[in-house]
C-alpha cells in the first residue's frame, strides 16, 4: 500500500507543470509526511467555467457546463463515497487496488468519471516493521500517481481522493508487495479524459520504474507529527540482506 508520501511543490509550480488552473487558494504547503486525511493536491478535470461557483463542481450545481479543463485542487486524502453517511470512513480508503476498481461497487463510478493525477516527490514504505524507505524519482518533475476523486458535502472543502496501487516490481517488491500506479506523462491525458478501460490500469512502463531510487531514511517519518526535508534525507547504508539503495 501507499500509506505515507511527500508532496512539496508549490501551487505555481504544479499548475504550470500540469497546465492546470490553480484552485488551491494559497492553502497548499509543503508536506514531507502526508498521512491519511491530510489535504493534498490533485489535478482533475472540471466542466465548470472559470469564475463559476466551485460548489457546482461534482455536486449537481446549476452552473452551465463548459469544455473540460484541468484544475489543481486541494482535497482530503481518503476517498469518501458520495453515499457515505460517515465521512470518517475515508481514513480507511486511502488506497484502491487497481485490479478491482473497474468492478468494485465502491470505486467503479469514480473510475468511470472521476479520475485524477496525484503529484508526489515520492512515497514511503517500511520493510516489514524495520527500516523505512523513500521511493523517489529524484531531480526533475514530480512522480504522478493514478487517483480517483469524489465529492461529499460533509467533508471540509468538499473533495476527497484515493491513490491506486498495483503489484510492486523489481527491487521495489523487496520492500513491499504493492506500489502506487505510476503514470508517465504520455498517459496523463487518457487517465483524466479517456474512456474507462482496462488499458488505463496497465502497469507502469519499465523505464518509469527504472528511474526510481530506493532511499533508506530515518525512523522519524513514522510519527505523523514530524515534517521537514530531513525525513527524506538518505541515512546510512542498509544492512546486509536489505534492498539496494537504487534499482539499477
What are these regions (language model features)?
Residues 1-248:
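Short linear sequence motif anchored by a di-proline
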